[in-house]
């Protein structure tokens, strides 16, 4: 069918729905890591969210290694379900996967909010929280993969809106934390309000998903979905690797350069090329993109090895106990990272440098390892071995700015270059491989964070 026969997206309701769904897929991860001060305050034995980044890192609560565990248990499900996607998608209907995941995430986040009012021992609170983190992020992995499958049937604009929603999830969480801190209410009420916020976001996501079958525009495209459930994984791969000109942002902190995935154009091309090539070999495709895939792994390994495990421990060097000490980490760590990461991913919509034939990319990616010692030598009061060299706040802010924008740019660049290194009929496999290596890099970085934390 031609696009001219498609109904209009009245009031952009479908676009808004997919934007909110994108936001909902990454709200859990971002709200957990942004609330590290609250969790460390609870693990110190106090039911308070008043613990600020400037106070909680000097307490013995870091014996739980909360920062490290929340990162690892958030990323391992992504790696696991990347491997299980094909089997899972064939066994469970799409609507059950999406709606069931959203409801499970809502209930688990409601539990997290309820625990604000419940006095628990630090050990029990840690165990319950880690279990919630694992299951919430497992459902998020299923949800994200399933929604990518739906987006494969929609015009590319809706892929962009979905990814833009993901990109703003981290910024939204940081702003929610700042609002909570600035509210002036008691710490417990502030924490309760903070954790209710993502519950509202997930509830809106459920409403948006349930509304899609009632919107003519959504029905027009979603009914063209292939019958075989396994196609959802393939569509996800195509979404990741279809555009040769724009960046493809996929990570715990996403954003939205333009994607060029048009199902109508694909149908037209299919009619023009009746003789399709044989199924591409995974090994052959891997040989073509292995260096780009390695770069993607290294980018996320560096990022997750210090963010948020080390960066969330950095405090202001100011001796005054004023507002700046309370707002320093939420602003300079989480808000700055998410804004600059989003900016870095967006840059690939305008230029791609270095290109796929350049050997400069691996060198630039490896240079990011310098951020590990730089952050470890910043003002982290709780340390036993390394000295503090970069005392001033300006050092940390500068490092974070470069760290975040380089993460966003190189992630988007590698996801963009991979499909350019293979033949058109191999891009699907290339996208699937890059998805796996993305998850591998996240898990490797989360695992390394334990080592770097121990070296402080």
UniProtKB/Swiss-Prot annotation:
Q: What is this entry's stated membrane topology?
A: Multi-pass membrane protein
Please name the GO terms of the biological process aspect recorded for this protein, alphabetically.
adenine transport; adenosine transport; cellular response to insulin stimulus; cytidine transport; guanine transmembrane transport; guanine transport; hypoxanthine transport; inosine transport
Transmembrane stretches in the record are 13-29, 69-93, 98-116, 125-143, 161-185, 193-213, 292-311, 324-342, 360-378, 394-413, 432-452
User: Could you tell me which residues carry Phosphoserine?
Assistant: 251
The record's annotation in Pfam families points to: Nucleoside_tran
GO CC entries: apical plasma membrane; basolateral plasma membrane; plasma membrane
Q: Which reaction does it catalyse?
A: uridine(out) = uridine(in); inosine(in) = inosine(out); adenosine(in) = adenosine(out); thymidine(in) = thymidine(out)
Glycosylation, residue list: 47, 56
- State the similarity comment: Belongs to the SLC29A/ENT transporter (TC 2.A.57) family.
Also noted in the record is: Transport activity is insensitive to nanomolar concentrations of the inhibitor nitrobenzylmercaptopurine riboside (NBMPR). Inhibited by higher concentrations of NBMPR (1uM-10uM).
| Alphabetized PANTHER family for the sequence | EQUILIBRATIVE NUCLEOSIDE TRANSPORTER, EQUILIBRATIVE NUCLEOSIDE TRANSPORTER 2
Q: What does this protein do?
A: Bidirectional uniporter involved in the facilitative transport of nucleosides and nucleobases, and contributes to maintaining their cellular homeostasis. Functions as a Na(+)-independent, passive transporter. Involved in the transport of nucleosides such as inosine, adenosine, uridine, thymidine, cytidine and guanosine. Also able to transport purine nucleobases (hypoxanthine, adenine, guanine) and pyrimidine nucleobases (thymine, uracil). Involved in nucleoside transport at basolateral membrane of kidney cells, allowing liver absorption of nucleoside metabolites.
Put simply, this protein is called Equilibrative nucleoside transporter 2
Give the species: Rattus norvegicus
Ranked from the top, the taxonomy reads:
Eukaryota, Metazoa, Chordata, Craniata, Vertebrata
